[in-house]
Regions:
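C-terminal motif of bacterial Sec signal peptides marking the signal peptidase cleavage site
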Residues: 18-20
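Export/targeting segments at the very N-terminus of extracytoplasmic proteins
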Residues: 36-38, 160-209, 247, 262-264
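Extracytoplasmic small-molecule ligand-binding "clamshell" domains
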Residues: 27, 31-119
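Substrate-binding/active-site groove segments that recognize
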Residues: 212-238, 246-256, 340
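Low-complexity, Gly/Ser/Thr/Pro-rich intrinsically disordered linker/tail segments
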Residues: 332-377
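Extended ligand-binding regions for polar small-molecule ligands
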Residues: 22-41, 76-88, 124-161, 175-179, ...
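Hydrophobic residues within well-ordered alpha-helices
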Residues: 85, 108-109, 137, 202, ...
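Catalytic and substrate-binding regions of cell-wall glycan-acting enzymes that process beta-1,4-linked
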Residues: 124-125, 132-136, 272-346
């Protein structure tokens, strides 16, 4: 059965489900209340075609409520609901992130996407004669589905238990033994010209020295290598729990990041950016550097870039035209660099260094809210 392309509003989520249409003018309201020019849609497409293709294409805008990448895992309330919808159809979901609502409209014109999602309150509108579409709406327009997606995302971001064990941050301080893997750190740190204790500090931050650690996003092993990263590095996925293989893979990734930030000549500063990119992704860090540079800051000085890493969590900044990769949960990345630098200093037996940036005023310690429920450092 053929349908017109209608607006589907799922709780607080606007879906433009492009199920089919014949030369029809569509009136599109942007998330900001403005009306786009009418879009002439002339594609014929139905659910059977989507299922036959095996792929549902979602266009959206970057943001915490729509879609973003977090340590290699796709998140966002609207994304999670669209993923559920794709699962119900038995197809995979592909995401096309657009710059703005005008680009979303262009995707409609070109027939490049099957649905568009953004946050916009309103009502459901559907032609009652289109019984299949109406039934789809009845099945999916439940407030509980939106709430369930939000709860799923919250659970993923605040997960307390993963398959890991807690190891001491230092086995024998008197003898200078940090972990059971010091030999591997000493061997592979030479490839990246790091102090081996810095790599050990990073490893503790990643996995607490547990070779079997697994994050909610699927990162594995001592240095938390993602399966996709392993593929890129030519490392067999089934070897990621092997300590030496995992540390060697991390060294390869660190070396790639060093090359990616070779424009930062000062080694200490370059290492800060490498650590930040290992955690948050080099593209996001480059976005923060671009913002810092535009505002007259030194883009090669981490203390001047770190505030912009945090700003990438706010719409004013992640929607800025200079930003290419959108929303980022930057607080974890800034904290990541600080903690590794501090632990590295403790491994060296010196006072924790001041790298020039602290995201907040000192406050009473509370329970950690990162992907591992670690004991206090």
């Amino acid at each position: 059965m053929r349908f017109s392309k209608d607006y589907l509003l799922l709780g607080s989520i606007l879906w433009l489900l492009l199920l089919s249409c014949t030369h029809k003018q569509e009136r599109i309201v942007t998330p900001y209340g403005s009306v786009l020019d009418s879009v002439n849609v002339s594609e014929d497409f139905d659910l059977a075609d989507i299922q036959t293709s095996g792929e549902l294409i979602m266009a959206t805008l970057t943001g915490p409520d729509t879609y973003y990448d977090y340590h290699g895992k796709s998140l966002g309330t609207q994304y999670l609901i669209c993923q559920q919808f794709a699962d119900s159809l038995g197809v995979r979901l592909r995401v096309d992130v657009c710059r703005d609502s005008s680009e979303l409209a262009e995707k409609l014109r070109a027939g490049d996407v099957d649905l568009v999602a953004w946050a916009q309150p309103g009502n459901i509108e559907a032609d009652p004669e289109k019984t299949d579409l109406a039934e789809t709406l009845r099945q999916w327009n439940r407030p509980s589905r939106v709430e369930a997606a939000k709860q799923e995302e919250t659970a993923l971001l605040t997960v307390k238990k993963v398959r890991r064990r807690i190891f001491s941050p230092m086995l024998d301080k008197n003898k200078g033994i940090i972990s059971n893997y010091d030999g591997y750190f000493q061997q592979y740190s030479r490839d990246v010209r790091w102090d081996w204790r810095l790599m050990a500090a990073q490893c503790y931050q990643e996995s607490t020295f547990d070779p079997k650690a697994v994050s909610f996003a699927g990162a594995k092993g001592l240095m938390q290598i993602m399966p996709g990263t392993a593929d890129h590095l030519g490392v067999p996925r089934d070897k990621l729990y092997d300590p030496e293989t995992n540390i060697a893979a991390a060294a390869k990734l660190i070396k790639e990041l060093q090359q990616a930030f070779s424009d930062i000549r000062e080694q200490y500063e370059r290492t800060n950016f490498v650590l930040a990119s290992y955690n948050g992704g080099s593209h996001h860090i480059r976005d923060a550097m671009a913002l810092a540079s535009r505002d007259g800051k030194n883009p090669h000085h981490w203390a001047e870039v770190a505030p912009y890493v945090l700003k990438l969590a706010t719409p004013h900044y992640y929607n800025d035209p200079i930003v290419k990769y959108g929303y980022m949960r930057g607080s974890e990345t800034v904290d990541y660099v600080e903690k590794i630098r501090g632990r590295h200093a403790s491994y060296q037996g010196v006072k924790s260094p001041h790298i020039g940036f602290h995201p907040s005023q000192p406050r009473k310690a509370d329970k950690r809210k990162n992907k591992y429920d670690l004991k206090s450092d």
